Amino acid sequence: MGVSLLASSSAFVTKPLLTQLVHLSPISLNFTVRRFKPFTCLSRYYTTNPYNMTSNFKTFNLDFLKPDLDERSYRFIELPNKLKALLIQDPKADKAAASLDVNIGAFEDPKNLPGLAHFCEHLLFMGSEKFPDENEYSSYLSKHGGSSNAYTASQNTNYFFEVNHQHLFGALDRFSGFFSCPLFNKDSTDKEINAVNSENKKNLQNDIWRIYQLDKSLTNTKHPYHKFSTGNIETLGTLPKENGLNVRDELLKFHKNFYSANLMKLCILGREDLDTLSDWTYDLFKDVANNGREVPLYAEPIMQPEHLQKIIQVRPVKDLKKLEISFTVPDMEEHWESKPPRILSHLIGHEGSGSLLAHLKKLGWANELSAGGHTVSKGNAFFAVDIDLTDNGLTHYRDVIVLIFQYIEMLKNSLPQKWIFNELQDISNATFKFKQAGSPSSTVSSLAKCLEKDYIPVSRILAMGLLTKYEPDLLTQYTDALVPENSRVTLISRSLETDSAEKWYGTAYKVVDYPADLIKNMKSPGLNPALTLPRPNEFVSTNFKVDKIDGIKPLDEPVLLLSDDVSKLWYKKDDRFWQPRGYIYLSFKLPHTHASIINSMLSTLYTQLANDALKDVQYDAACADLRISFNKTNQGLAITASGFNEKLIILLTRFLQGVNSFEPKKDRFEILKDKTIRHLKNLLYEVPYSQMSNYYNAIINERSWSTAEKLQVFEKLTFEQLINFIPTIYEGVYFETLIHGNIKHEEALEVDSLIKSLIPNNIHNLQVSNNRLRSYLLPKGKTFRYETALKDSQNVNSCIQHVTQLDVYSEDLSALSGLFAQLIHEPCFDTLRTKEQLGYVVFSSSLNNHGTANIRILIQSEHTTPYLEWRINNFYETFGQVLRDMPEEDFEKHKEALCNSLLQKFKNMAEESARYTAAIYLGDYNFTHRQKKAKLVANITKQQMIDFYENYIMSENASKLILHLKSQVENKELNENELDTAKYPTGQLIEDVGAFKSTLFVAPVRQPMKDFEISAPPKLNNSSESE
């Protein structure tokens, strides 16, 4: 649950203006020279009869435009109360899902109750007249392998869930009560104010939220964009009471007035046939009230002349150096078929030769750039460019602004050009035609929201990303709006002068006018010969041939094509999705890269510099729906490549050759070193719960180091050290490769040969292949405590992670811990977050490290960490009786939920490939571990689980590691009088992590589950049954 940073329903932008500006993924943006045949059904929106009227609801006769391999069936209906629903039958779905989008959001908050829409979203989870228990909905989903969430945006509120497919109706039954008969119980209302307040406090030191709110605050007060929308205890508790307002009454009024059926769009995905889904929709949602409320419009301009031609100087929490320039532009939302913002985003956000970013990097002024269009409300649209500056770039920020206008000037002189549109169109066609299925909950959530765009025919709702109209005049109109008079700049750095503080987050800032000389240069920037349009893309695919064989059963694991002293080659021809795609994973086992913290940091710099040098290749590939990356791992280095298979191996070859011939440059070394130092420093200012994994890994794993330790080393690295280190990287190399997809095995063998030809020496080290990371074993019956104060002295939240180390990893123990995590998941959240209101972030899970099995609970809270530890221990103690009293039927439901989740079929080729990659990386080659684990879970008895609880969780022999990240802010308002300070915190304090680790044994690495023999790939035929 939460407030979304989305300020509009724009399909092009996923972050707020002036925070994380969007240059859309090049998959959907870029272009190709060769043309596809046009889709024959693009113009078929309705059949002759637009709809059929049954006795209960209206069914529209639509011819949906779908990706080629989409086997789902779709139906669009309207209930008598005007609620509209898109129903999706997926006969193969393991998870069903549903989402309801209300076309009302935070813009409708009353002036005297900021955050009410968000608060209403929270309260709808707390029970309905039909299901009054406040955790009934979440409990039902948990028992049946489900999950849920919601968000409140400016003009819409979106609720969604997914659940094992057999239990869709029960979940829908509970879900529908949100909208027809919510309770808004007083007790729940009072408690949930604390949850909203905790959510707000979680974001108080988050620069994205701080700068977003500052941007809003410095706009026209007559437009609701100006408002604070999250809410807190002051706006929803203290002030309403002082003003004689009953917040529960206001919630009821808000829900009655705005949660009107005619403003709701529902999307349901399940295995059931469309008639059944239609009947369920009618039965469960027909009672949602319709008061005929119209979708509100917000006609006031967000930016008036007094808000433009300004520089907003912002002092961030983190060490950021950014320049963001935004323009008011024509609203192009309804021109979704030609998408002028997308074309401009592609051009200004390009990273290849001749681009704005390439030139800024050459000057040493920038590291990253993004650009994107953004509609906040009808008639209020923006286009923005966001640049991550270097120190030198910050000094030359005015020159950077002029360069932006020089690039815009070049575009005004060069556009429109039909070939750019053609290439973008062809890439969007290919991406749509071969679109892979995503998660059910994200699918329905996105579609429910998109249905609010009533200017898009419902039959095209699946194909909104396509470019189908060439409208050069609109592109010219859009580009012509990028002028100084329509712009304002946000400059972000700790070094800037400020004179004001924003009301809600306290962000320090100062607003100054554009200097006269800057305006002059912005208006007459001239042309810069270094700035040009991107070249035609050599990586665009034109051959999408797939030799599909019907009626075969997919293999469960790849075959081992080759194994010798230097490498293993795993291969699997796609036999499941029949997509023209491929996935390549190349893992170099390189002991020298992690022999010390210095070597580890030098390896990080090496990969960063190599990626930087090969950015031109990477970016052109990304524009053509191919991806390639080069990263450091805790075993060495890894290259991953994916995308349309026609040119995937060509890309890999080019990239490998580039890495092989790469020679670092000192100027880029200094810039990337500085960028990494800033990144490491900023990690120490992240929200506490996101820092926890780094501290935990640094304590429990071999050759792992804390952020502070990495920072200390990184600051002292020299260019000479890197130059001397690079020749040693590939000594004793061993590598493993996975090639998966629409790729021939002969091509896979060629990849192995190519890599071997590039290896600089033939020193064989047979131990390298087993040099995997291992975790330390805690002594039995011992509890250890690690404490550290947060670097951010203003963050009010602390965080605790309570880890029980069960034992050395085994399949049996993994099954037991997995089921235990399933059993405690909902009660833990309900107890510690909902009932005790400890904090917004409460999380529990099983945790399998490098050789050990564990259970953890994590809480981020304003409470002290000793208090949180007490409440965690209390939860564990009381859960024993809950487990013993649990009806056998409920216990079996939890087993079924976990087994169904483990046995989910792959949704797409990327998911399948990731499963194989993980097994290769872990070294156990247990490609079917989820199936094996499901069998083990199915055989666990309730008594075995009670024994597990008593012997592992509550036993005196339990081994525990408890991490305390402590806020420096003392909260005197919290009541912790019941805490036994003589007892908590528990455990032996770890004062020196290195000394502590030196006393411990390490766990064994996972061993191969079976012997694999080298074999040729099996010939695919249709003699076996399909999956």
From Swiss-Prot:
Keywords: Hydrolase, Membrane, Metal-binding, Metalloprotease, Pheromone response, Protease, Zinc. Optimum temperature is 37 degrees Celsius. One of its GO terms (molecular function) is metalloendopeptidase activity. InterPro entries: Metalloenz_LuxS/M16, Pept_M16_N, Pept_M16_Zn_BS, Peptidase_M16, Peptidase_M16_C, Peptidase_M16_M, PqqF-like_C_4. Its cofactor is Zn(2+). The active site is at residue 121. Coiled coil: none annotated. Inhibited by chelating agents like EDTA, TPEN and 1,1-phenanthroline, as well as NEM, free cysteine and DTT. One of its GO terms (cellular component) is mitochondrial matrix. Its EC number is 3.4.24.-. It is a peripheral membrane protein. This is A-factor-processing enzyme. It comes from Saccharomyces cerevisiae (strain ATCC 204508 / S288c). The gene is STE23.
